[in-house]
Amino acid sequence: MADMEDLFGSDADSEAERKDSDSGSDSDSDQENAASGSNASGSESDQDERGDSGQPSNKELFGDDSEDEGASHHSGSDNHSERSDNRSEASERSDHEDNDPSDVDQHSGSEAPNDDEDEGHRSDGGSHHSEAEGSEKAHSDDEKWGREDKSDQSDDEKIQNSDDEERAQGSDEDKLQNSDDDEKMQNTDDEERPQLSDDERQQLSEEEKANSDDERPVASDNDDEKQNSDDEEQPQLSDEEKMQNSDDERPQASDEEHRHSDDEEEQDHKSESARGSDSEDEVLRMKRKNAIASDSEADSDTEVPKDNSGTMDLFGGADDISSGSDGEDKPPTPGQPVDENGLPQDQQEEEPIPETRIEVEIPKVNTDLGNDLYFVKLPNFLSVEPRPFDPQYYEDEFEDEEMLDEEGRTRLKLKVENTIRWRIRRDEEGNEIKESNARIVKWSDGSMSLHLGNEVFDVYKAPLQGDHNHLFIRQGTGLQGQAVFKTKLTFRPHSTDSATHRKMTLSLADRCSKTQKIRILPMAGRDPECQRTEMIKKEEERLRASIRRESQQRRMREKQHQRGLSASYLEPDRYDEEEEGEESISLAAIKNRYKGGIREERARIYSSDSDEGSEEDKAQRLLKAKKLTSDEEGEPSGKRKAEDDDKANKKHKKYVISDEEEEDDD
């Protein structure tokens, strides 16, 4: 194992390097504040890279996650073995640093906060923001591993080896974070890294240990310079500024790291292309870059609850913002008027609309209503005449007319006896007195009765519920209230013998009885129009009868004249067309005349007397027989002709009758 001076250097060297780093870091911090205008702390590792071009930056020394891809393909198992050897030596070095308080005092006085800020920017590549809040021991181990990695390699191989180490650490830590979201935040880097170192120690080789021991001093000097510059810049920030600006520092640092990683990727790409790397390395490098960026964002999100535990107490959380109701937190619109209480006028309670009053001058009417005031709903058998009675203008009721009251009910037509009237007359002294035909009598038992002419009605008193019945006097188009009714009166007939009761029962009987809609009136005399029509009908029948008699008589006369004529004489041409001249006239008729004689002669021929006589007689008889046979042959045709003649006669007779009937109709 190398000596402590070889690893950390002497005190004189550290002081000289600290001065140089202080001057460089101060100028870098001024340039960073002027350029960005963001938080005072910024990203110290990035400021060192921008300000001091001669001094190597953290990215150049340790590399970026995006550079891991190319180095991993070329280094292989050598990088893993070197990394495990470096970690074993880093653990021994951390033990020595814990026992040496002088080294701690040489730095900014508080190594734990400085180590936290320093390692928050240097360790673990894309995920070093999430590891910035770990324990002091974990950060010191990261620092020592970084130093050992630098000493393991030459100047050309430093960047690749450091990239391999950081990518392995970031990938291992990302796997642990995805598996346990809650337990990963509580575990420190110190617990993870020893496990990895134990697994890799089994693969160590003695040759790699020797190479790492030779290369340590060169890298340790650079680490001391970077640590001293970072340690002196960090105390300048107060604790409160760190708490307030912690959230702002992380996104800025991550953005700047991505820029440097892009620049370094381009340089690595050029160097690897010179060495013959193909396009597959570029594709894998781009994928690794995207994965690291997403992991760094996820780690920064998970770190916020731990880092901001103090800021939550000072400034409150996001839940406190939406605690109030939407309606209460809404500020009033700029154009909307606001009342004294800060509420818009629309939300104020609407004021009641004042009553509309119209001033009108009307005369006041005072009426003497007496001591008692009663509300009366008159039945249909009572009525009141409001105008005074005057015999000159009195009009009696007509039975045919229907009398309707103010409510539309039909009044019983009792004429004078059921109407309350009043009149003005003068007494003996000449004073005007109001007189009525009705009066109310109050008996000793408290009951009352109404006497209207000769009729008596019982009066019943009942209280009224509520103040809904008022007495008004009409004043032009308005009404003037006078009193409120508290009691009401009802009237009923005193007995069934009264005329009013009889009228009521009769009216009910008339309503119940069915009236006959069709009435039959007796005929006092005969209608002259009907008699005239009947006389006309009789005359027409008589004329028709006379016409019939005349037609019958005419037919009888015609029949008598037509008896001597026959069809054989009227139509001689129908028979014997071969014969001509006078012989052709009615030959059939002549034959018919002698038919009877011929038959008699036949009887004589076949009689018993035929044997008697002379031979001459026999010869004559033969000749006659020959003639008869010839005549008999012609008889069938003659009979047929006779039948046709009879039919013709019959047809002719029918035709004549029809003519007569037509004449009769005419």
Curated annotation (Swiss-Prot):
Q: Where in the cell is it found?
A: Nucleus
Please note every region of biased composition (Acidic residues).
1-14, 179-192, 574-583
Q: Where is this region: Disordered?
A: 1-357, 547-583, 602-666
Asked if Phosphoprotein is a keyword of the record, the answer is yes
Query: Which positions carry N-acetylalanine?
Result: A2
What are the recorded Gene Ontology BP terms? endodermal cell fate commitment; mRNA 3'-end processing; negative regulation of myeloid cell differentiation; positive regulation of transcription by RNA polymerase II; positive regulation of transcription elongation by RNA polymerase II; stem cell population maintenance; transcription elongation by RNA polymerase II; Wnt signaling pathway
Tissue expression notes? Highly expressed in skeletal muscle and heart. Weakly expressed in placenta and liver.
Q: Which GO terms describe its cellular component?
A: Cdc73/Paf1 complex; centrosome; fibrillar center; nucleoplasm; nucleus
Secretion signal, residue range per the UniProt entry: none
**Superkingdom, taxonomy of origin:** Eukaryota
- Pfam families (UniProt xref): Leo1
**Where is this protein primarily located?**
nucleus
Q: Name one GO molecular function term.
A: RNA polymerase II C-terminal domain phosphoserine binding
Q: In this chain, where does the modification Phosphotyrosine occur?
A: Y606
User: Which UniProt keywords are given for this protein, alphabetically ordered?
Assistant: Acetylation, Activator, Nucleus, Phosphoprotein, Transcription, Transcription regulation, Wnt signaling pathway
User: Phosphothreonine-modified residues are where?
Assistant: T188, T629
Q: Which InterPro entries match?
A: Leo1
**Keyword Acetylation in annotation:** yes
Positions where Phosphoserine occurs in the chain: 10, 14, 66, 151, 154, 162, 171, 179, 197, 205, 212, 220, 229, 238, 246, 254, 277, 279, 294, 296, 300, 607-608, 610, 614, 630, 658
- According to the UniProt entry, which residue ranges have a biased composition of type Low complexity? 32-44, 316-325
Q: What does this protein do?
A: Component of the PAF1 complex (PAF1C) which has multiple functions during transcription by RNA polymerase II and is implicated in regulation of development and maintenance of embryonic stem cell pluripotency. PAF1C associates with RNA polymerase II through interaction with POLR2A CTD non-phosphorylated and 'Ser-2'- and 'Ser-5'-phosphorylated forms and is involved in transcriptional elongation, acting both independently and synergistically with TCEA1 and in cooperation with the DSIF complex and HTATSF1. PAF1C is required for transcription of Hox and Wnt target genes.
Q: Its quaternary structure?
A: Component of the PAF1 complex, which consists of CDC73, PAF1, LEO1, CTR9, RTF1 and SKIC8. The PAF1 complex interacts with PHF5A. Interacts with TCEA1, SUPT5H and CTNNB1. Interacts with SETD5.
The UniProt entry's sequence similarity note says: Belongs to the LEO1 family.
Name the record gives this protein = RNA polymerase-associated protein LEO1
Q: Which organism is it from?
A: Homo sapiens
Q: What is the lineage of its organism?
A: Eukaryota, Metazoa, Chordata, Craniata, Vertebrata
